[in-house]
Structures are given as structure tokens and as C-alpha cells.
Amino acid sequence: MPYHHEAVPTSARCVGSFAVALTFFVASAFAQGRPPQLPPGPMLDEGTVALEASELKELNLTLVRSSQTVASLKPTATPDIDYTPGDRLKERSADSFYHLGDLDLRLRSEGEKDWKDFSTAHERHPVRVLSAEGGKFSADLAPTLPADIPINVTRTWSVQNGELSLSFLLMNRTNKAVHIGGLGIPLVFNNIMNGKKLDQAYAECSFYDPYIGEDAGYVQVVHLNGLGPVLLVVPEDHTPFEAYKPILDRRDRTTGKGLLLNDPTPRGTTFEGSYDWMVHSLGFAETDWKGVEEWNPATEVVLQPGESLTYGLRFFVAPSIRQIESTLTAHHRPVALGVPGYILPTDMQGHLFLRYDRAVRSVISEPTGAISIRDDGHRAGLWHAYTLRAEKWGRSRLVITYSDGTVQSIGYRNIKPEIQAVADMGHFFYHEQWFDDPDDPFHRTPGVISYDNETGKQVRQDSRVWIAGLSDEAGAGSWLAGAVKQFGEPDREEVAKLESFVDGVLWGHLQDSSGDHKYGVHKSLFYYQPDAMPTNYYDSNLNWKSWTSWNIKAASDVGRSYNYPHVVAAYWSLYRLARNSQGLVTKHAWQWYLNQAYETTLAMRTQAPYYTRFGQMEGTVFLHLLEDLKNEGMTEQAAKLEEEMRIRADRWKSEAYPFGSEMPWDSTGQEEVYDWTTYFGYKDKADVTLNAILAYDPVIPSWGYNGSARRYWDFIYGGKIQRLERQLHHYGSGLNAIPLLAEYRAHPMDLYLLRAGYGGVMGPLTNIDEKGFASAAFHSFPDRMAFDPYTGDYGPNFVGYALNTATYLTHDDQLGWLCFGGNLKEEHGAVSFTTLDSFRNRVFLAPLGLWLTLDAGHFSSVDYDPRHKAIRLHLAPQADGVTVARLRIEHTANPPGALRFEAPAAWRIDAGAYVLPLQANETVANLQAR
């Protein structure tokens, strides 16, 4: 649930009392009782010095002379970009502010029980310079570390083989063995957007994402606009990327100084925080992170008296996001490429391609037997190929060892077959989360309500009232996912319950059915109004004194536009189901549902106008609605809807970065901005949007980060564990996958887009546990590493999946034929593939730019024979309420030399779809080449 940082003009505010609370909260929610700001420290008194080396051609490094930490790190190709927060150097010059070049340690001498922490950032003193000439800067860090530290630390900046090198030499200076249970290298880059306007942030700031892959790990630092060179941080020698520890902002309440291992830079919606590259982490795994399954097993190293070890990182740049992997290869780093990614349904073959200068010695699965592995040999002499199959549900990892001893780890998530996972989710929604109490004073029944998986109970009260109030992303999430599930994978009992929810709750309570605010959508059905309830009605264990505990007036407000797409999506889903099946939808005709979706969309513009200037979460549903209005011949309504959307798109066209929201920076509006700027032909703005998405939606060998659009504050608004934290596969994953895959269908030679988009489209399935509970998101911090117990705002994530899931066939010159979302067979130059995504109603053949979709019916498999210019569709047998298939054929691109395929002339057309009678067994249909 995002909230806008800037004050809203009074005339446009949602509701007076709420707007005041809203503005106050965003400015101070993360800082209530915040300590004073630290004044600048003396670390800059001696000025700065540049590292000068002719062989360092890609980066310009400037160091603070007294600390030899980074003052600025800029790519030579675009020197106006600083990867580090050099613009804040003065304000971050006091003790406890971290800078690139610092070091964190957790140590324990032999015979001692407790670990002790040390940091070069906590109390700064000028380091003892050992070398400060041209291309090499070395310093003894003893002056900036406590006197009782049992090791000496020497830091060196240098250039090695054209790469910038940062190394730390650690020597045990005592007569006892020293256990190093925590060794963290702080990664401080310019992701601090505090106080910046949106355009300024896009011009100056960067995001960074980790591949926590042991010796093969790396960090990529990407400019917010997605353009320009990408900074890559990789291990030097044996400096494995074992864990990723957040640097929090806990401070001394009196002085404002950061506590040990903390940085006082305020974390919030405009600053996610910095992180430590953890080389060793056993000291944390035994204490702060005890009992948590990490990305990799925690380790320590024991340094004997007089013994020394060296750890380090190297820095170089890739010319662009899409060239990250080729740049890693050029710098002799291991590269992994997974198809369809790193989320493996148990009925789907996965493929892993490895590329490195050294041969693979072994590939093993942890836990043993979690993934079966078949060695397929080499592709194009470059990639070592493997076929994978998930055997056990849950988290797993592959550990690859190369002939030189390099170890690479890849995190996988094994899930049930997609169709089963989604069916389990639906069953859980309409049984465990089904709330049916006719005496509920808030008119929330019958319906699907939020759920707490930790207690095993429905969330009928929460002081963030929207969670229990069926509105906002965190309250509508469950019923929204349960609704859109039905148009792709309907269940008769669930559809009946959904219709009862629409008639009994949505229309007339959550949404006004008459009066001045007809079609307006309330902010919450649940509210905190103790004078209107029996004594002790509200749970006394909850804090009802926050702004989040809206009274009935605030909860009834209809001015938040972001609540409207949820309702539109529910109506539209029932329209699609009623239109394309027989007897499943019984309460209203399809025309009623389509009109409800249309009127609700217009009401968003008239009753909640302010935030419609921004892209809406799930806004893609408006584009689908427009297409359906046209298909049904409702030209007047279609013209009106298009006019309203053009007004919004014209505004976005005029803005440099049209991604405003309720927050100063967000990753949710881009989905709809891309849709409409593409639809109206504003390609330059669509490209700006796409590049911005690629900046925060990485392709990384990890089920958690691959295609996981950056989100880090919504646990505050929708989670049970409320904290600022990088959320993995929150709803940004599913929603941002929509433009990524749409763009891929327009440019089917760009495999990077498919990999990024498909990682995002499969992400929402990982949130579904074995019994069907769907969590808001995964907690990435190493003290938790688990899905949140609340369903929260999962719904928009599943909307992204439902509107976007498909099976993709493509061909790569090096990797050969690839299938995302199905199993592929190749024989005599022809290929066939099964469709194994849950809906099985969309197929894309990339070599042809051919997009095949079914409004009714399901694909079971597709045969494609390039030599004989043939496509054969295998359609699943008749199902409950579905006796005909309704096929749409679209060429979204024209790849060089591609044939165009069309339907036989004899096929009947209805509302733009080809109608094919289904048989009791499989139906086969052939497309014709021309």
C-alpha cells in the first residue's frame, strides 16, 4: 500500500482528515522519536585524492584522504553519474556513516564464548597511510578500529588486470587463534533518494541487486533510468558471497550516532538501506539469525597466531544491463542461465546452462534428491547444459564445483505443478478464508477475507483497518486473487461463492450502488468507531491510536483511485467467464458484469481523480476492458473509455519520468504507464518506462531475486512482520512482468526480456504454500528468510500472473530451442511442446511473432514444423461449462523471414474470436501459412 510523500492540494485530497494524517505519516512514520541529525565530521578535513592508473580505463576513483574510503566512483563513459553517494559526502562524514572501503568484523578468540563486533566506520580516525602513489593506496586500519581488536587489518586499493581492486589483509597479532565468524564488506552505493525529486533521483541514483552465489556471486549497480554502464562487483580470489546482511539505521537516541554495525542515514520509502557482502557469517547464524535457512551454509575461518588471510572485491563495468553476463564472461567469471528460471514446477523440465573458463567437476542438489540433474553436454561449444526436474517441494539449491575449486550456488524454489498450486490457492481462499457471518456489523460477508498463516485464523481485526476491511491492496488482496483465478481456472463452487460476494458485499457495500457516489469504492469496510460498537468489541491487544485506524467517515471515503482496479478486475473476470462458458455464472448475464467494469472505471476518474494522474496497480485490466468493449461492439463506451485513458497518457507523455504514485518513488505505476503509452503510440515514453523497469527488475540466478521487482516498504502496510525490508516476489513481480513480456512479444529476439518477464510471472506461484495459503511476499533479511504470515496484498501479484501467464517457444543461436512454461521435444527439425502453466490459454511462438490466445478452452500442446510450414494446435477436451474454444490469432512482431499463419476460412468468428467445437477427447486444429 503506497502513500504519496508530497502534500496533495486541498481541492484534490481524498478526505481532509485522512490527507493530513497521510502526509504526516509518510514524512515521519519511519522516524517517530528519531534522534537528532549528526553534524558533519572531520573526515573531509584533509580533502580527497584520485587513484591514477593508465590501465584503469572504465572507472574513475576518488578517495577521502584521511580514511581512504570512496569519495566518488564514476564510469569514464558517463562521468556525471556517481555510483556512490558522493553528493552527500559532507552530510555523511560523521562517525558511524558507512562508505565503500569500510569493513565489518565479528570475532571470537579461542576459549571465549561470545562474539564481538568491530567496524572501521563506527568511530573514525585517520588511517595510517602505507602507500598513496598513483595506482595504489594502502593503509593500516588500526587507528579506526578499537585497540582490543585481535587482528591487524591492511586495506589496499589497486588496479589488477585493468580491474579496480579492493583488498583486506587480516593478520592475527595475538597468541590465540581467532575465529572470524563475521566478515562483511559494506556495499555503499547511491540508492539514497532522500529529499530528491523524482526526475533528480532518476538522473543521479542507482539500484543494486545481489547474486548471493558463493565464489560466483556478484552485485550489479544499475542507474535508475536503466541506461548507461552497469557497475559489477565480483569476488577477488576466494571471497565468497555467502550472505547479504542489511545495514540498519538504529541510532543512539541522544547523540544520533549509529549503533555499532548501523548507519544513521534514515531508511524509508526513499532509501532501502545499504548491505554487507558477507564472506563469513557463522557468528550471525549462531546468534541473530539462529534457526533460519540462509541462501548458503554459514561459515567461519580460524586464523592462527601470526597467520594472515586476504579477502577482496573487484569492480568493472558492463556497457548495459543486457551485457552483464557477457561482461562477466569476458572477465572470466562463472555465468549461469536458467530456463524457465529458478522456479521449478514438479511436472516441468528445467534447463541450466553454465559458462566458465574451467570445466564443471560436479553439480549436486541440496537437500539431496530435491532436484534431479541430467548432464546434456555442451551447446555451441560454450555452454554446459543440464536438464533439471524438481522432486521435492520447497527451497533447494544447486552447488556447482569447477575444476579450479570455484564453487557456485544457485537458489531454486520447487513448487507443485502450476495448475495444482493455483487450484490449492483457490480452495484455500474459498474455504479457510471464507467469512460468512450474517451478523458482521461491517457488511463483509459472505466473502474471502485476509488470513494469518501463523495463527491459522482469519484476520477480522487489524489496526491497519484496510487489512480487515476488504479494500486497499492489503485488504482486497485475497478476494481479488480468488476472483481473477476463475476466468482462467474456474471451479463451479468457487464461482458461486464469488457471485454471492459480488451481490452481497461488493455491490452495495464496498462499492456504492446508488446516490452521489454510485460506483465509488470505499477505502475500507472495517473501521475503528468504538462509540458505535458494543463495549470491548475491538481487540485490546492492538494499537488503535495510529492514523491507520480509520473511523467510519474516513473508511467510507471513495477518493483513493488505487482501490478501483481491484473491483474492475473482479467484474471483468466474471464477464470473461460468463461470456466464454455455459452455466458457470448464474446471477447475472455477461453484459451486466462488463457494464459494471466499465462504469467502475469511469467512476475512478470522476470520484477519485487525483491519483489517476499516476499509473494504477493492475491498470492493465483497463486495457483488456477496452479491447472487450470493442470486441462486443460497444463502440460508444469504448470511445469514452479510450478518451479518458488518452487524457492520462497525454499527461505521462509530457513528463520525463511519469512514475509518480502515493510514494516519492515507486515500482507499481510503470505497468499501466507502459500499457497506455504503447497503445497510443508514445513509443519514446514506453521505452523510458521499460528501461526503468529493467533497472529494478533484475535477471539473477536466484529464485528470489530473478524477475523480482524492487519493493521494500509494503510489509509496513500489509504484512504481519512490519518493517522496511527488500520484499521478494511482492506484487511488483507479477505486475511488472506484464510490460516486460509485452515488449518481448514485440521484440522476440530479445531473450533478456523473456527471462526477466518470466521470472516475474512465475514469482507469484512461490508465495503459495503446500496447502494453498498465499503470502504477501518473502522476507529477504537473513534473520527471517520466510514468507510473511499474512495474505496481505498478494492479490495484485496474482493479477499480474493471471493476465500474463503463457507458454513461450523461442530459439537461441547458442542455446537452441527453449520453452518457458512447458516441456519441449525436438525431432527431425520439428518441435512440439506441452503447455504447463496453470491457465494454458496463451502461447507465443517467438520465431514467428505469433501470439495465440484462448478466451475459452485450453491448449494441451502445440506442434511447429518450420520446414513444412505447419502449426498444429492440440486443444484439451470439453470441460465443465466449456464446449467450444474461442481462439484469437495475432502477429505481434515480424521476425526476419517469418511466415504468417492464419485460420482456415471455414472457421466461424464471434466477437473477433474463432469458435472451435471441442470434443470429448483432444481436438486438433491446423493453422495455415501464407
What are these regions (language model features)?
Residues 15-28:
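Bacterial N-terminal signal peptides
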